[in-house]
Amino acid sequence: MKTGALATFLALCLPVTVFATTLRLSNEVDLLVLDGKKVSSSLLRGAESIELENGPHQLVFRVEKTIRLPGNEERLYISPPLVISFDTQLISQVNFQLPRLENEREASHFNAAPRLALLDGDAMPIPVKLDILAITSTAKVVDYEIETERYNKSAKRASLPQFATMMADDSTLLSDVSELDTVPPQSQTLTEQRLKYWFRLADPQTRHHFLQWAEKQPPS
C-alpha cells in the first residue's frame, strides 16, 4: 500500500465506537499483548495512552527500569512477562502504579513475587488478577501472542478464555463495529487489519504523529 493511500486509509479508520476508558501508558512498562493481540510497538512508541472499550481487558507486559548496582554502576532490569486482567466497566481511566525498584534486591523480590497496582482516575485501586506468563517456547524470538493464547486456555489466575478463542480468527480484530464482520477482500492483508486495529486504539496525538511519519515515507 502506498504511503499516501495508507495515511488516507488510516484517517478513515478513526473510531466510530465511543471508547470510555483511557489506559495511561508508563515508560517503565513494555506492553506486549493487549486482549490477546500482539501490540504494534512501532505505532504505539511514544504514545501516552490508548483508548479501550468498557469491559474486561488483559495486558501482557514487562517492567523495564534502570536499577543501581554496587560501585555506582547501573543496568537495565527487565522483569519476566506478566499477565494482568481487570474490568473497566465503570472506569474511565487506568494508571499503572509500580512498586519501588531501585536495586538488585528489590528486582529479585519482584521477580519472585511481582506486585503492582492499577489505579483509576481518582487514584483508587482497581481489582486485578496478576500472574507471571511462563514461556514454554524454546525459540530465540518469543511469540507472546501464542504464549498468551496458551495461557488463556489453561485456567490460570489471570486467564481470560474469551481472548484465547479470539486468536483463532483475526476477523475479530475490529470486533464490535468491524468492517471485518464480513469476509475481507484478499487485498486486505492481516498486516493491514492489525495496523488499523492499533491505529484505532491510539490516542489522537499518536495518530497525528504516525500519519505525519507515514506521509514522509517513500512509496513502495
UniProtKB/Swiss-Prot annotation:
- Record keywords, A-Z: Signal
* UniProt-listed Pfam families: DUF2057
Disulphide bridges in this chain? none
| Signal peptide segment | 1-20
Top-rank taxon:
Bacteria
Which InterPro entries does its entry note? Answer: UPF0319
Family label: Belongs to the UPF0319 family.
Could you identify this protein by its name?
UPF0319 protein YccT
Organism annotation: Salmonella typhimurium (strain LT2 / SGSC1412 / ATCC 700720)
Q: Which gene encodes it?
A: yccT
